[in-house]
A protein has these predicted regions:
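Compositionally biased linear targeting/interaction segments
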Residues: 2-252
């Protein structure tokens, strides 16, 4: 009788253990499914919010404006010239920060690509002035100036301070010079002389990557260009100060 009772007790304990395992597995499965549902829901909401932000930004960009400038806060705004008025009027911007939509909200920022220096067509003198404004020393500027021209030209002949494929193929991760225009500003990081610190910037200065564009920009928009870009254009400190103060009141 004692043996039978012991066997029954072991059987009961085994069943209880199996039940505990099954219940635990079911609970984990339910939590996983709930987490997947939440992730899917949040993903759908995030996509709709992102699309809404893009469409609202496009509404502003496609507005009937002739002048793009910065307001007192540094926000990009659009102006429209009316017949009989010498000063363009500012179009009221749509809300861009924490715009409520359903259970979520979105924010966006509009930047002017023509506020940057066109790296493929700016010319060596403007690039050199921009590097000087970023406090790059003469030796490093010579290397970057020549290496950028070598990167863009169609041959493999390097300039005095430049570099072509023979230099880049000796690096730990070898690659060839493009021998064509840059397709993205980040490509500057592949060019001899351009460091990550120079490209990314620091707390007290912006990076080179924020000041240039690979887009085919015909002219720099002085209404939105930063003082550093204005300096690269050859403006003096007094001229830059005058432009920055005047363009807020009356864009050029």
């Amino acid at each position: 009788m004692t043996r039978e009772r012991g066997f029954v007790l072991l059987a009961v304990l085994l069943v209880l253990t199996l039940l505990a395992v099954v219940v635990t597995e079911l609970a984990l499965s339910a939590r996983l499914e709930a987490s997947m549902v939440r992730s899917y829901r949040d993903g759908v909401l995030a996509r709709h919010l992102a699309e809404a932000a893009v469409h609202q930004a496009m509404r502003e960009i496609m507005s009937p404006s002739q002048v793009t400038a910065l307001d007192e806060t540094g926000q990009l705004v659009f102006h429209r010239a009316l017949p009989g008025q010498t000063t363009p009027i500012r179009l009221p911007p749509l809300p861009r920060r924490r715009v409520a939509l359903g259970p979520g909200e979105f924010s966006y920022r509009i930047a002017d690509e023509s506020a940057r220096l066109a790296i493929n067509g700016a010319g060596a003198a403007r690039l050199d002035r921009l590097l000087a404004a970023l406090r790059v020393d003469r030796t490093q500027r010579d290397i970057i100036d020549d290496s950028l021209q070598d990167w863009r030209d169609a041959n493999e002949l390097h300039r005095l301070h430049g570099a072509e494929s023979d230099f880049y193929l000796q690096l730990p991760t070898p690659y060839r010079a493009r021998n064509a225009n840059l397709q993205d500003p980040a490509e500057l990081l592949q060019i001899r002389g351009v460091t990550r610190e120079l490209y990314g910037g620091a707390e007290d200065r912006p990076g080179l990557g924020e000041l240039v564009t690979a887009a085919a920009v015909s002219a720099v928009n002085i209404n939105t260009a930063t003082p550093l870009v204005l300096e690269a254009l050859g403006l003096s400190d007094a001229e830059i100060a005058d432009v920055v103060q005047t363009r807020v009141r009356a864009p050029y």
